[in-house]
Amino acid sequence: MVQQPKHRKALLGTLALGLVLTAGILSSCLTGGGKAGAQPALILGIMPSVDYLPIAIASEHGFFDDSVELVRFSSPMERDAALQTGSVDGSITDYMSAMLLQSKGQELVLPLATQGSFRLAFGHNEDLMRLSDLEGKHIGLSSHTVIEYATEKALVSPKGKTLPFTPVEVQKVPIRLEMLRSGELDAAILPEPFATLAATKGLRVVSLPDGIIEHITGLAFLRKSYETKRPAVVSLIKGYNKAIAYMQETPREEWVGSIVQLLGIPPEVALQLQLPDYHPAASPDTTHFAPILEWMKTKKLVPQSYQATGLVPPLPDLQ
């Protein structure tokens, strides 16, 4: 059974951090440069997470040739709700969320793989040094998400069985971090920039075992938007590739402001932030769906007959 936190005194300690992290979320949208009005705008939902960084940089540097609007959200629930209602045309999401939406009848496609970054942070208990030390401990997570999936996959015995632990439901990542600092949690998987923030606060942060959470996010679109707003989709992908090339060829000091604006973190943290190895646009490898989908079926989140058929369409011709 997933435990609920007994109190919320950690919330006060999180307030300052939350204000910092949401500072860049207050504006409702940013518009990429280009032929405004030439085509219906492609509206993307974005969040303060490193997998959105190439899109944010492309928007700021005018790498989009067509109208691409970025609408900021502060939580995955808000983002996914906007996608479900058609308020946005697309957003980066994890494979699990995309498959869950498609299994419920959402006309969704996932044409582009993206790169995120997650690590596990320990609390202040100095006896906890390895993943195997977390047997029976209190682990913060959000149920039925890739975080719960990754937690179960990471905490395994030498024989491959999931180690028993006490899951504590903490959906908001800033609160999860503050509960680690206050001793209410023994460990939790955190996305960037929160893992780096945990390290700057003196918490021990470790990488997850290879393959568990390396290939789990992609850029999803409503199928209708992907098919009818093709010029803007092509512009988005070209701009995405230009942004990655720019990041690879330019010292981080020259674009650290984009990290600060997107993630709401101080420049000194942005400079040491562990960023993923960004790749130019490519389709998701559907073999990475299999372990996630198997886990989802075990949890009865999708029907046993569901196979994610048609979820990954071909990328458009960029010529």
Name each region found by the language model.
Residues 227-303:
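Secondary-structure end/capping motifs
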Residues 49, 77, 92, 141-146, ...:
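Soluble non-cytosolic domains of exported or imported proteins
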Residues 56, 99, 152, 196, ...:
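Predominant activation on well-ordered alpha-helical scaffold segments within soluble catalytic domains
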Residues 297-319:
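Conserved C-terminal helix/tail region of periplasmic/extracytoplasmic solute-binding proteins
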Residues 96, 126, 164-168, 172-259:
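Pocket-lining segment of extracytoplasmic ligand-binding domains
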Residues 36-163, 167-170, 179, 186-192, ...:
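Short, glycine-/small- and polar/acidic-enriched structural segments
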Residues 1-41, 319:
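Short, low-complexity disordered leader/linker segments with a strong preference
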